[in-house]
Curated annotation (Swiss-Prot):
Residues 101-182 form the PRC barrel domain. It comes from Acinetobacter baylyi (strain ATCC 33305 / BD413 / ADP1). Keywords: Chaperone, Cytoplasm, Ribosome biogenesis, rRNA processing. The lineage of its organism: Bacteria, Pseudomonadati, Pseudomonadota, Gammaproteobacteria, Moraxellales. The gene is rimM. This is Ribosome maturation factor RimM. An accessory protein needed during the final step in the assembly of 30S ribosomal subunit, possibly for assembly of the head region. Essential for efficient processing of 16S rRNA. May be needed both before and after RbfA during the maturation of 16S rRNA. It has affinity for free ribosomal 30S subunits but not for 70S ribosomes.
Amino acid sequence: MTPTQNVPEDRIQIGQLRSAYGLNGWLWVYSNTEPMSNMFDYLPWFIETKAGWQTVDVKRWKPHGKGLVVSLKNVSDRNAAESLIGSTIWVAKSQLPKTDVDEYYWSDLKGLTVLGLDEEEQEVNLGQIHELFETGANDVMVVRATADSVDAEERMIPWHKDVVQRVDLEAGRIYVNWGVDY
């Protein structure tokens, strides 16, 4: 682990160091990649700690139960591992595969303004995408109200072909077939 100022501008979060595992510096790691082991294809990792940005090198990793554990270079005991708990893991976005047409990384969708329909079928601002999560059937967008949205409601809108009509990353907007009263 080394302090760094060379954090990629195009970085994307791919996981988080969750908790210490054992006495030899291993950590449980949460992965945002699919499959979860893909996070080890994108190295080096940059982690954001209380002390600032650090570059970390993965020594070893292994599946354990339903999750993953990792051993990092220069993290050799439980105390060192515990100091990293909660650190987010980032990589250069340029390392990730390009998306196909109508495919998006969640990080590209967060913060987009969501435009839906009112009772008269007029376009209205429903808020901004705050986060996304999986349900098994389809992904769900958590849309939080903003100062200029139609109301103060938080909405959970499914990412489904019948709902999501168009995504305009350049304009920072997503158009949905979703009413104010849903």
